[in-house]
Amino acid sequence: MVFVDYLSARGLTNCRGSGALNAAEIGRDVLAAARYLQGQPYVKASQITAVGWSLGGGAVLAALGQLPAAEASPLRAVVAYYPYCRDLQPWQTKVPALSLMGAQDEVAPPEVCQRVFAQLPPGTALQARIYPEARHGFDVSDLPSYAKFGSEIVGYNAAAYAAAAREVEQFLSRKSD
């Protein structure tokens, strides 16, 4: 497992209120990390999956749009938890993607992603799930169910977390060699 630390590499401690960050730039970091992993002898290169949360979720989706058509993808799949899609552009790739969103998300509203997803070409391998009572951070068990994050509300939702965990497990098991 590798975590792409897109904050400290840019001298930042968080992504809140930073116009210096966008999903496309971080998507390039994701692809660079995946390409690096492909060259490591201890890595099964055909099994590299990128998983991201919030801005990182938008980044793993943005990485799909940066894959050259003639190049084999270093990613077998991507999973995006409550992705931040404001900067996201439609992509065209065969790499399967799973997007898990909360209908009550005020930080990364699912409607923004849905507009992008509606522009994807037919045959794009995307599964999008929206959990009705879930907010941003629905899988973070350390959060209360209702917490302020700046002016937005975030919170843990046990039912959405359990459903998303099952969804991810099923999604990834279908992608195994």
List each model region and its residues:
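Primarily recognizes the serine-hydrolase "nucleophile elbow" in alpha/beta-hydrolase
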Residues: 24-94
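Short beta-strand/loop motif that positions the catalytic acidic residue
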Residues: 93, 99-101, 105
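Acidic catalytic loop of the alpha/beta-hydrolase fold
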Residues: 104-108, 136
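Short alpha-helix in the alpha/beta-hydrolase fold that links the catalytic acid
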Residues: 95, 109-119
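Serine-hydrolase catalytic machinery in alpha/beta-hydrolase-like enzymes
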Residues: 1-42, 140-154
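Alpha/beta-hydrolase-fold catalytic nucleophile elbow
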Residues: 5, 51-53, 79-82, 100, ...
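C-terminal catalytic histidine-bearing segment of alpha/beta-hydrolase fold enzymes
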Residues: 125-177
